[in-house]
Amino acid sequence: MKIVGCDLHARQQSIAMVDTETGELIEKRLMHEGNAVREFYASLEGPVVVGIEATGTMQWFLELLEELGIKCRVGHPAKIRAAETRKQKHDRRDAEVILDLLVMKDRFPDIWMPSTEQRDLRTLLRDRHQWVKMRARLQHTLQAIALNHALREGRALWTAAGRRALQDLALPPYSDQRRDELLALYIQLEKRIQQLDQQVETEAQQRPRARRLLTHPGVGPVTALATEVFLGDPTRFATANQVASYIGMIPCEHSSGKRQRLGKLSKEGNSLLRYLWTEATLHAAVKDPELKRFYRRKLVQKGMGKARVAAARKLGIRLWIMLRDEIDYEEFCRRGKLPQKGKAHAGMPAYNSGPARAVTGSTE
């Protein structure tokens, strides 16, 4: 059996490979130009296991190894780095560290990997989010033009009447040209976002899990689909705190002895899902009585920012439970409040409100 530790970069990779039968160790650098990578891995005989750390440019490599029938294990970058105690860091040494973790039983920090379909749906959601951010920047610019010429329409500026009022403003030649171009671009963005929204809604309605999440007040197709595809298999999380940790909705902690110091959110998880949960909370807290009471209580205690985060976390945990137990909002309400620490409903694990543990998961 051949075990390969691979330090993967955008243009090259360094490998450290050991043959478990002969004990031979091979170190090599492969450039990604041409067919050098394919030829090397295709030439390996017998069972082969390759280990890499998760990166943003690894997809092509995973697909290549899958095509060649080679098993690839993807590791958590921070945990792989934590295994290195030496002060010297270079590509060859990084490959050796990955190899060492692969050789030592149960030491390699595997992460959960989404399926091809889930990755494709994530692309759809990220694409929509990028267009929405572009629209927001464009709206700010057009609002500035309107305010500078005493047109105070607020959100009504994006209605047909508001756009006509903006179009009718008498501006100098270059300002007029800029206004017209921005308005034309805004209309194009609106059409594209509407197309993407329709695609997201179609996907959400076709998926039983997402349809269940849509039954929760304030949760729309984008949030429902994103929760399903970014959380993945809900049973891989043992507690609610693990879900919050995975999304980055737990505070950083610097405690020692009897003194506990909690800081800002870790924000180590998926930023898009964290954003969508926070936005959905604004609607859910109006329509759901329990969430509304919780948000108002935190608003008095902690202020608006922390109250929104706390309510978003609570909403996200609800959606996770609905995914895990395959129930809709009506059944969730029938069961009552979340179980307290140490208690559980029939068929449900206890809700752990203690310290969050690190969760192995996809870095996408």
Which residue stretches match the model-derived regions?
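A detector of single, family-specific signature residues
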Residues: 1-364
